Amino acid sequence: MSLFRTIPTPGDFAPLFRLLDDYDNHRSARGHASVQSFAPRFDVRESNEAYHLDGELPGIPQSNIDIEFTDPQTLVIKGRSEREYHSSSDDNKNDQADTENQARGESSEVAKTGEKQVSTKKAANKSRYWVSERSVGEFQRTFTFPTRVNQDDVKASLKDGILSLVVPKAVPPTAKKITIQ
């Protein structure tokens, strides 16, 4: 029997709460597997003349990225990332051998149904993911600038997976005095 009573502190339960949160996040992510989305990371800095945005979009072709202004001070960057894999040389050799065998009529996987021949291809080398850390699916980021910007002179470039934008600030309107005649 203990002489001192131990009172649990909120920090004692932190690992348990983290575990429950991870489980909840995992379950909710599986339910929405049909439409995956993510927000790419951006660095935003301001100079005297412009705003500079640099975002990580690795492996996304330029044709899958849309940049537009939704209002005078709001810029939206959106697009789609797809998972693509290139088969290894062994896979290419197997595919070429299968194609050559089928061309010569040596396919061992032909089933005759009446007068029709139905050839069944081997199931493609289906892979099972052990870890899936790449961001795949739709993405969108919205940036609202605190000052007016010159939409006509925005410059964007995509190099080595980094999308760089230069959004020049608009020249502040000057007061114009009108003389009365």
UniProtKB/Swiss-Prot annotation:
Any one Gene Ontology BP term: cellular response to farnesol
Region of interest (Disordered), ranges: 79-127
Alphabetic keyword roster: Stress response
InterPro entries: A-crystallin/Hsp20_dom, HSP20-like_chaperone, Small_HSP
UniProt xrefs under PROSITE patterns: SHSP
Annotated S-S bridges: none
Name by which UniProt lists this protein: 30 kDa heat shock protein
Gene that produces this protein: hsp30
